[in-house]
Amino acid sequence: EIRLSLVGSEMCIRDSNMTMTIMSAAREVSALGDDTDMAALCKAISSGSLRGARGNSGVILSQLFRGFTKSIKEEQVLDIPVLTRAFEKAVETAYKAVMKPKEGTILTVAKGMSDRALELCDDTEDLVYFCEEVIKEGDRVLDLTPEMLPVLKQAGVVDSGGQGLMQVLKGAYEAFLGKEIDWTVTETAAPAGAPFAGSQETVLEESDIKFGYCTE
């Protein structure tokens, strides 16, 4: 499911920096043979996303992947407690990668989902319900980003980094459900003056990112 979600997600993310990050991870995952294990898969996702990371949104996404995969690399089954810990580790890693975290960005959306996962962890054993509720919370927080960042409210858009993250999570969930993925890649130019989702690129300076390479 992880393998499919990476390839599927790259098809629908409009943020080019995040797309390049996802594509880099997907290429490394695709290069793995069929007879691979969780540790190798996690290493490919982490290193591939980090190598392909572009811009703040891409770097932060790679750090979310890094924390998430580091948490699950020794696991054989991804159940609710494992996923909850992975969400927490992903958010912790991403926040540590930014010197001056700003709310209303991809970081806020990720933290909202992590917090919701923690709330649900002891209340349900239904993985489908768990995933749906976590994604629902991510969408809710994403819709609030214009209220957190004046630049987004002025433009009348949500944060594009957070929006891209939601596409990644939804792609992973659809792969988990066994839904067919549309492999068609289309590139369309937005009409002049059409509103794009804002990005944390406008509110997080490049100098805010502590590192763009693996420190391990």
For every predicted segment, state its role:
Residues E1-G8:
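Single conserved hydrophobic/aromatic residue that forms the stacking wall/gate
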Residues R3, G33-L50, K136-V157:
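Short, hydrophobic/aliphatic alpha-helical segments
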Residues S9-E10, R14-M20, G48-R66, M148-E174:
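Conserved phosphate/anionic-ligand binding catalytic regions in large, soluble enzymes, centered on
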Residues T19-G33, S62-T69, K73, Y95, ...:
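Regular secondary-structure segments
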Residues R27-G48, L64, S71-V91:
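Transmembrane helical cores of multi-pass ion-transport proteins
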Residues V77-A192:
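Non-catalytic interaction/clamp surfaces of large macromolecular machines
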Residues P195-Q200:
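Accessory interaction regions appended to the cores of large information-processing enzymes
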Residues S207-E216:
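Short glycine-/aliphatic-rich beta-strand segments at the starts of folded cytosolic domains
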